[in-house]
Amino acid sequence: MKKLFILLVCLLPVLAQAQMETSVAGFIPLSGSGRIVYNFNPGWRFHRGDIKGAEAVRFDDTSWQVVSVPHTVELMPAEASGCRNYQGVAWYRKHFVIPQDMKGKEVSLHFEGAMGKQVIYLNGKRVQEHLGGYLPFTVQLTEQGVQPGDSCLLAVMTDNSDDKNFPPGKRQYTLDFAYHGGIYRDVWMIGKSSVAITDALEADKVAGGGVFVHFDNISGKKAEVYVDTEVHNSGKQTRTVAVETVLADAGDVPVKRVSQQVKLQAGESKTVRQRFAVRNPKLWSPDSPYLYRIQSRVKAGHEVLDGGVTRVGIRKAEFKGKDGFWLNGKPFGQLVGANRHQDFAYVGNALPNSQQWRDAKRLRDAGCTIIRVAHYPQDPAFMDACDEMGLFVIVATPGWQYWNKNPEFAKLVHRNTREMIRRDRNHPSVLMWEPILNETPYPRDFALEALRITREEFPYPGRPVAAADVHSKGVAENYDVVYGWPGDDEKADRPEQCIFTREFGENVDDWYAHNNNNRASRSWGERPLLVQALSLSKSYDEMYRTTGQFVGGAQWHPFDHQRGYHPDPYFGGIYDAFRQPKYAYYAFRSQSAATLKHPVAECGPMVFIAHEMSPFSDADVVVFSNCDSVRLSVYDGTESRTLPVVHAQGHMPNAPVIFKDVWDFWEAREYSYKQKNWQKVNMVAKGIIDGKVVCTYKRMPSRRSTKLRMYVDTEGKQLVADGSDFIVVVAEVTDDSGNVRRLAKENIVFTVEGEGRIIGDASINANPRTVEFGSAPVLIRSTRKPGKIKVKAHVQFEGTNAPVATEIELESIPSELPFCYTEEETDAQSAGAGLAGSPVRTERMAGKVVLTEEERQKVLMEVERQQTEFGTEK
């Protein structure tokens, strides 16, 4: 577990303050607001494949599975790259009743995201089509004539097949990520009054719709706040209402309250602008991500008709060219972080909100201050979490190495850009928009129009800037920030521009084989993981060997994930696909200042020994620390050395510490074999600041495998009983003293009792799960009933001297929002039956492109050409 080295004084506040709020269609629900929200995730009938008449009300779907969304069309093994995932049509059908408390409300369904193309039918009638897998869409129910108490049938056809007509457009077999299918994000049922705040995407107005908050004249003494609220009257009569805006602090205590009357004719919309000042504002920053709460209410007299909460952070971000990046009136230093794909072991893109939050926390734990969401807008829950964690975000429009000359394609790209800005514009975490297509040779007029749109959609001071690759037409001379490399700043001819590396850390032999010392599967063990950590440290160091004009970079990529165009998963993560940390995580973590006090992330002094003391371990011992120096003692202090942690100007904050010629297995054997004193074989690293020991890490060689041990990877966030949430439980093979047996080779069988289900089975190598580097993870999904869950683990083939079984208990908590569903989920979805491993080969290959070796070489050479052209060979 990565938390072992953290000081207790830092860890306790982390666990106490780890709070997650999830927005619904742009708003956090506000009690007593008049807006009703239901969780619409449970109770969907699912069928993978096309089937005639599946939209009809009388269609017999009783043989279909009942599942909850977020949902993937097919559970896959943890290593399933190379277009092994299903691509094609999949159907979802939901039988439901409009709740009675929706009487008098305008009822709609808000889909946060479903992959590819979607066609929606209500009660057998086709009502909508949506193109694209990364942005939300809304289905109006009341407009279709349904009323509270009505029994309804919603059918959704999804299709994640390759489609060149809408972004990203690229065929998956030439794509560096995967189009995992399904309704893979949340679905909400929302009831609003006839006079209500509009949805920014539905309103479809430039820099308008919904609630739009921006700030001006920001300092530590004062900030001007502007809140634009669009209200619509869908009724048949003229209404006069009050738009009330309350700025509250993080504890919901009002700081400022303003109200303004507005008269609306039937069918009319109006935007109300409210301006006020905040004295002595608490400014948002990565180290202190303070969030105010804008409470918006629409009132008719004392009755609240509609409302919601928008969380905002007051901060001033400036890119000053050769003077670098400034935050809140001060030089910030380097922005160093990572890219992020929304990919998780087994479930593909179908992460619940809790795992979105945990991912953001893991990235901030690792010392990241900026995340590039590559290559598409991410789940709203991830954006909410970035606000909480103090993670700056570069939001990218969907696209990767593909350009369609049909003018409609460019229009759809620009449409996506407008929608992503309207969705994410209030997040203080958003620092840059990336409105162009990644690594794509698009025409100059496209780049200029994309830039114009970002400025048109956010026309106020302090707006997020636009970033794009310096090699692309129309970018170098026009964009606010250009993507480049360390050293580009030395020859830059535009002093007003800042330079940022969009993807650092890649060192492939070529873009066909992808052999790379920065990519190491956790299963490969100690030596590859150490090489990866040191190689990434070198790349990290390059982000600091620059002038002020170079403002930072994002590592590619912090989480292992599946890809389309290569048979190997991407193994360059500092975490694996289950979010188990590698040595590289500690290399990144050690770059955070020891003095950092963060309200959520792990922080404070740390020291970590990247060495397993095995018979095959190196003689040199590498230690990662953010202290002044490290004292390494071996054999109960028989030998001891102290080395400084180098903090050189123009280099990474804390260089790895390498103790030469420390470990010798034969020397250790003298204690354990000849002296019968194996307890003396240990290493202790002590982090020292100002002459005092502030943190300690101890290693011992693992001895005989005797037992299993489990822990729950909560990150301080409990499992929610909503039928969609899941959590990772990890079983470790240990010796008598609890040292993890990294070289153990076992298969672990998991069972569960109570209100939990195991995701996956033997067909995807999920259960039993092979031990890798000492551990085997399992995914536990909640039911909709809160309660205790007991997880048990034992080795697949038990025996007298086999490791002893173990168990662990956790408890799920109630969901905050009510559910709307009529059918209970079948166990098969959690177990994986029918979802993974079941399709015969002919079904799995149906619809897939089968290439000759010559054809495959040709398309892969084109990918290689584009990646080389855009400079990613560095």
Give the residues covered by each predicted segment.
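Substrate-binding/catalytic cleft of secreted carbohydrate-active enzymes
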Residues: H302, R358-R362, I370-Y586, E602-E612
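Accessory beta-strand-rich segments of carbohydrate-active enzymes
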Residues: G26, L30-S31, D50, Q87-A203, ...
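Active-site-adjacent substrate/metal-binding segments within catalytic domains
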Residues: H71-I98, M102-F111, M115-N123, Q128-L131, ...
